[in-house]
UniProtKB/Swiss-Prot annotation:
SUPFAM superfamilies, per the entry: Glutathione synthetase ATP-binding domain-like, PreATP-grasp domain
Protein name per the record: D-alanine--D-alanine ligase
HAMAP family in alphabetical order: Dala_Dala_lig
Gene Ontology terms: biological process: cell wall organization; peptidoglycan biosynthetic process; regulation of cell shape
One cellular component (GO) term of this entry: cytoplasm
Binding site for ATP: 131-187
GO molecular function, one term: ATP binding
UniProt source species: Sphingopyxis alaskensis (strain DSM 13593 / LMG 18877 / RB2256)
Cofactor note: Binds 2 magnesium or manganese ions per subunit.
Length: 308
């Protein structure tokens, strides 16, 4: 299909913990497409989404959902059954990438360096630490750092963790515990078959959690990151390799920790996000700008890939 004009249904919102982020992403995408002359149907995801899509009859669906069910293969399967073309990754890739443990199983055998970890259930935390402190607890299938905590010796969760501790992970049953990797937080966006740039995330206080990601002023984005050329290239190579191994489509974003005292050996891939944010503060649009691509062009590029 040509560059349009297209009729694009933008799926956003939903009921995951990342609903508000998705609404911001969806609004940005829809506004950008309309500014380029495309017809847009905005759909706040609900249980009647299939009926609403059937009525709209779009040329393509822009999936701006984050979390379950828009990022775990559920929506992708529905769109496949309905015969709609859609942006970003397909069913199988989404099922694997949303699950941090499955992602490790898919990538580590191919030489992608990732932290060792162990699966735990939240109840077991009250009797024994799963790893030596400090360690990171994260839900297996949430994004945007929802439910993530760093458990340190001096944390207020208790030792062992107390049932009265108000840890952000408590609403989740399946957790992944990983060693805490000291150092710097970096991320690489991949668009199509190109790694765009490396961004360093410098948090004013604490760590790069949900609030730090989506509250203006809490995190400084340094793009391109001030890191050695070989480190930047290694991260871009790993992000592109992970994108290809998982079968990602459209845009993805790979998050890294880098222990800068150990050079290339200190680079660890944390996760691959197949539905990266498209808010004004989001990293993929920022990296696109760094390589000369404005927001509306980025959105059109993602839609074009879905239509080819």
């Amino acid at each position: 299909m040509s560059r349009g004009p297209w009729h694009v249904a933008v799926l956003m919102g939903g009921w995951s913990a990342e609903r508000e982020v998705s609404l911001m992403s969806g609004k940005g995408v829809a506004d950008a497409l309309e500014s380029r002359g495309h017809k847009v149907t905005r759909i706040d995801m609900d249980r009647d989404v299939a009926l609403r899509l059937a009525e709209a009859k779009p040329d393509v669906v822009f999936n701006a959902l984050h979390g379950v069910p828009g990022e775990d293969g559920t929506v992708q399967g529905m769109l496949d059954l309905m015969g709609f073309r859609y942006t970003h990754s397909g069913l199988v890739t989404s099922v694997i990438a949303i699950d941090k443990e499955l992602t490790k199983q898919a990538l580590v055998p191919h030489g992608i360096p990732m932290p060792t970890g162990t699966m735990v259930d939240s109840e077991s935390l009250f009797s024994v630490d799963p790893l030596p402190r400090p360690y990171v607890l994260k839900p297996v299938n949430e994004g945007s750092s929802v439910g993530v905590a760093i458990v340190r010796d001096d944390s207020n969760y208790g030792n062992p963790i107390s049932r009265d501790a108000l840890g952000p992970w408590q609403q989740f049953d399946r957790l992944l515990a990983e060693p805490f990797i000291k150092g710097r937080e970096l991320t690489v966006a991949v668009l199509g078959d190109t790694a765009l740039a490396v961004t360093e995330l410098r948090v004013k206080s604490g760590f790069y959690d949900y609030d730090a990601k989506y509250t203006d002023g809490l995190t400084e984005h340094v793009c391109p990151a001030d890191v050695p050329d070989d480190v930047a290239q290694r991260m871009k190579d790993l992000a592109l390799q992970a994108h290809r191994l998982l079968g990602c489509k459209g845009a993805s974003r790979s998050d890294f920790r880098w222990d800068d005292e150990h050079g290339l050996a200190g680079i660890f891939l944390l996760e691959v996000n197949t539905q990266p944010g498209m808010t004004p503060l989001s990293l993929v649009p920022e990296q696109a700008r760094a390589v000369g691509m404005d927001y509306a062009e980025l959105v059109e590029r993602i839609v074009e890939e879905a239509l080819t």
